[in-house]
From Swiss-Prot:
Residues 168-192 are annotated as: Disordered. Keywords: GTP-binding, Nucleotide-binding, Repeat, Ribosome biogenesis. This is GTPase Der. It comes from Shewanella woodyi (strain ATCC 51908 / MS32). Transmembrane segments: none annotated.
């Protein structure tokens, strides 16, 4: 399971700066979908070979009363469920009463916590950081998040135990190698067969009170809920094996399956970290949206995370029954306007409470998974690349036309197409989006994002010295140049 790092601290100590530095390397995929913005509170990060989820908890003002009563429930849950807590302090401001109150709260939680003294640039860092040892949370790590100083070392140290325990990849170059890897036809077929035989992991996600629990109960059947109503840990979602129409599934329930008497609770506990971990671990995301509230910013944040993770996607607009036709028309119009950039995702209008439309969800889930694990040959991918190139020539870069040579499969779930050529990494984002959309239309991909990666081909003449002309060849060249000038 991917580890979670929570950033904790009073306001203005640099949590957002560190968050942006850690997550900015993962913005590229979200940028492929105009109209979708990255969530400012949580995101995926990749640094020094580690991949992890980072959460900016916020919500702590440091006062004793604030710790107990005014801290947002989201922040409490994030601290409780995180694997590692980075407790940020301000080295310039020194130790404050707010820092001491937060540290006392963290000590009571017995979390794996690292004290980070931020903003050490331009000051005597050792002297400034000495007083933070009084917090009683162990070693104090120095960092200047705005400049990036000390960030990599901090993450490496904090996540090293999880690398060993979870077998995480520590080789920073492996991701690039994975991108470049070309499947043989036999390997591609074997991988597809393996994926098709596995149960489909389906994560039901959505903001609070959209009906996740109701839908989960409807899918499982009321009589099965009690079976899975066992006390679980607060850190993990519930994994429920099930079968439908002869196909095996694992339903990842982020809300927690409850007894019938508890389903009608007005407030549903929402855990961001549970949701993000479920998205990382699943094959298909089922995003539930409330028809009465329309598309909220939190919906777009969850959607962006799912797309960034490359997950297949089905959208269910819940509570569709009992609303007027003019409201339905308005909701559909808003969906077209705000979700037009993910036209590959099926949208269903359902009532989880009454079961209307729920049965058809699994048709789209299976379609999305099959699209995400579909095998396409190198020859087909190269032919589509050539057709795209004929329809719309790549632009000139440094006075030379970018040339696309061939394409091959680079992975499944999500489908990855690797395009090789000359100077392809210098292609503008607009042309890369054109290629992504061209592949999606040509392959008739439904229910899953498709990733197109570009790999520059090696120049066989690079590094070779050009052969020097002989004296006679030099004279002949000069005579020819003079002759050309005279003709002009």
């Amino acid at each position: 399971m991917i580890p979670v790092v929570a950033l904790v601290g009073r306001p203005n100590v640099g949590k957002s700066t560190l968050f942006n530095r850690l997550t900015r390397t993962r913005d590229a995929l979200v940028a492929d979908y105009p109209g979708l913005t990255r969530d400012r509170k949580y995101g995926r990060a990749h640094l020094s070979g580690y991949e992890f989820i980072v959460v900016d908890t916020g919500g702590i003002d440091g006062t004793e009363e604030g710790i107990e009563t005014h801290m947002a429930e989201q922040s409490m849950a994030a601290i409780e469920e995180a694997d590692v807590v980075l407790f940020l302090t301000d080295a310039r401001a020194g130790l404050t009463a707010a820092d001491q109150a937060i540290s006392e709260h963290l000590r009571r939680r017995e979390k794996t916590t690292f004290v980070v003294a931020n903003k050490v640039d331009g000051i005597d860092a050792d002297s400034a950081c000495a007083e933070f040892w009084a917090l009683g949370l162990g070693e104090v790590y120095q960092m200047a998040a705005a400049q990036g100083r000390g960030v990599t070392n901090m993450i490496e140290y904090a996540l090293a135990p999880y690398a060993e325990a979870l077998g995480l990849n520590r080789d920073g170059d492996d991701e690039e190698e994975k991108e470049e890897r070309e499947y043989t036809e036999e390997e591609a077929e074997a991988e597809q067969t393996r994926l098709q035989d596995l149960p489909i992991k389906l994560a039901v996600i959505g903001k609070p009170n959209v009906g996740k629990s109701t839908l989960t109960n409807r899918i499982l059947g009321e009589e099965r809920v009690v079976v899975y109503d066992a006390p679980g840990t607060t850190r993990d979602s519930i994994y429920i094996p099930m079968e439908r129409d002869g196909r095996e599934y694992v339903l990842i329930d982020t809300a927690g399956v409850r007894r019938r008497s508890k389903v009608n609770e007005t407030v549903e506990k929402f855990s961001v970290i549970k949701t993000l971990k479920a998205v990382e671990d699943c094959n298909v995301v089922l995003l539930i949206v409330d028809a009465r509230e329309g598309i909220a910013e939190q919906d777009l944040g969850l959607l962006g995370f799912a797309l960034n993770a490359g997950r297949a996607l089905v959208i269910a607009v819940n509570k569709w029954d009992g609303i007027d036709q003019d409201i339905k028309d308005r909701v559909k119009s808003e969906l077209d306007r705000r979700l037009g950039f993910i036209d590959f995702a099926r949208i269903h209008f359902i009532s989880a409470l009454h079961g209307t439309g729920v049965g058809h969800l699994f048709e789209s889930v299976q379609e999305a998974y099959e699209s995400a694990t579909r095998r396409v040959s190198t020859s087909m991918l190269t032919r589509i690349m050539q057709m795209a190139q004929d329809d719309h020539q790549p632009p000139m870069v440094n006075g030379r036309r970018v040339k696309l040579k061939y394409a091959h499969a680079g992975g499944y779930n999500p489908p990855i197409v690797v395009v090789h050529g000359n100077q392809v990494k210098k292609l503008p984002d607009s042309y890369k989006r054109f290629m992504m959309n061209y592949y999606r239309r040509s392959l008739k991909v439904m229910g899953t994002p498709i990733q197109v990666r570009f790999q520059d081909g090696d120049n066989p003449f690079e590094g070779m010295n050009t052969k020097k002309l002989t004296v006679s060849q030099e004279r002949r060249r000069k005579r020819m140049m003079t002759h050309i000038k005279d003709k002009k």
